[in-house]
Amino acid sequence: MKKYRKLSVLLIVAMLVGLCACGSKDDGKKGDGYKKEVDTYTKEKDEASISFEIAKELGYKEKTSDTSSLTLANQENDTSIDIVLFHENSKSSTVVREAEDYGEDHSGFEHITIGDYKGSKVFRSWGKEDSIRECEIRLVLTEPSDKNMVYAVKVNFTKGLECEDLDVKEFVDSEDFMHFLSSFKVTLEDSEEETK
């Protein structure tokens, strides 16, 4: 009987170890494609890329070779994620590209807040000498932390669309865009919890 009890205990222990191993593999897969890059950014406080896969799943198309990554926003170096909307032949296609850094030569540029929507700031970008360089929506996903960082999405309208024609609510309420934002935000929150 003792022999059978020992075997039973060993069998149960082996099963528990197996379950733990499976669980850890599943946890590793959660957020796969995002988490490695986000963790790197959080620890090093530097620019990082996020997988383009979520954008592909939502039907986003890669316009050129330099539009294959997303960039996290950082207040210190004024970088942001860009989702750029182009209009061609009456058909719109959305691409993702790295943020532009205006640099010192563009110090005359300013962002004018044109409203708040769903807890996010909405900006319109103006160029020097009152000429409109671009129109954008910047949606802030998280509050600035003790690291002085804020995650945001910058929607940049640079061709075929005037600022006055921009319907912010319609764009922000679009199903694909909201799904993209919620997926991205959950990933950031998961990563922040792990690094605490």
Question: What would you call each of these model-derived segments?
Answer:
Residues G31-E53:
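Post-signal peptide N-terminal segment of mature Sec-exported envelope proteins
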Residues M1-L10:
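Bacterial N-terminal signal peptides that target proteins for export
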Residues G23-K25:
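Bacterial signal peptide processing site
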Residues L58, V153-K196:
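Surface-exposed amphipathic alpha-helical segments
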